[in-house]
Amino acid sequence: MMKSENDGYDYDGKIRDIDIADEMKNGFLDYAMSVIVSRAIPDVRDGLKPVHRRIIYAMWDLKMTYEKQHKKSARIVGEVIGKYHPHGDTAVYEAMVRMAQDFSYRYPLIDGHGNFGSMDGDPPAAMRYTEAKMSKIAGEIIKDIEKETTIFIDNYDGSEEEPTFLPGYFPNLLVNGASGIAVGMATNIPPHNLNEVIDGVIAVTKNPEITTVELMKIIKGPDFPTG
């Protein structure tokens, strides 16, 4: 079987010499970018990591919007791992639980029904017992997704399509914040008040040259869910 150049072989099967420093650099960068893009760091356009985006998109596809009834969390997790996120169900459910906790998210993206844990560290009930649907504000993140507002790519096995980002009618990255540790990169953004952020966006739109000091008069500081 022919080997590619990245395998350290020529196409005729002969071993070729490579510079170990270059190979380490290229390999590390490829791995780092894979972790950054595919797992650990949120996209600035919608403020979501892939697992969170896939949860919201799967719920939207299942018609589990705010005005509809709650459905079993296990149904959602199965949809996510079966179509978009080929990883363990535990990781998906943990992300989903956090999205429903009003002490973890300033503006929860999931409306949970049942035991979703507590501030004191009590664990949530198993996914077969809890139910969920999209929160009202989550509908604003995915609103108009069917109107060519995003770019779709094939899922992991090419059987479905998924969005690379959600349209986002508000800056979720600033509103709900984000944290993540990747390879060679990390982020930790606190949440902010929605009204203040929108006022700040309007101010920047009206005056692109606005200073940080002027903007801080509008957005005075973080707004954590626990006060």
From Swiss-Prot:
Gene3D superfamilies: Topoisomerase II, domain 5 (3.90.199.10). GO terms for cellular component: cytoplasm; DNA topoisomerase type II (double strand cut, ATP-hydrolyzing) complex. Residues 41-227 form the Topo IIA-type catalytic domain. PROSITE patterns: TOPO_IIA. One of its GO terms (molecular function) is ATP binding. The active site is at 129 (o-(5'-phospho-dna)-tyrosine intermediate). Its EC number is 5.6.2.2. SUPFAM superfamilies: Type II DNA topoisomerase. It holds the Pfam family DNA_topoisoIV. Keywords: ATP-binding, Cytoplasm, DNA-binding, Isomerase, Nucleotide-binding, Topoisomerase. GO terms for biological process: DNA topological change. A type II topoisomerase that negatively supercoils closed circular double-stranded (ds) DNA in an ATP-dependent manner to modulate DNA topology and maintain chromosomes in an underwound state. Negative supercoiling favors strand separation, and DNA replication, transcription, recombination and repair, all of which involve strand separation. Also able to catalyze the interconversion of other topological isomers of dsDNA rings, including catenanes and knotted rings. Type II topoisomerases break and join 2 DNA strands simultaneously in an ATP-dependent manner. Heterotetramer, composed of two GyrA and two GyrB chains. In the heterotetramer, GyrA contains the active site tyrosine that forms a transient covalent intermediate with DNA, while GyrB binds cofactors and catalyzes ATP hydrolysis. PANTHER family: DNA GYRASE SUBUNIT A, CHLOROPLASTIC_MITOCHONDRIAL, DNA GYRASE/TOPOISOMERASE SUBUNIT A. This is DNA gyrase subunit A. It comes from Spiroplasma citri.
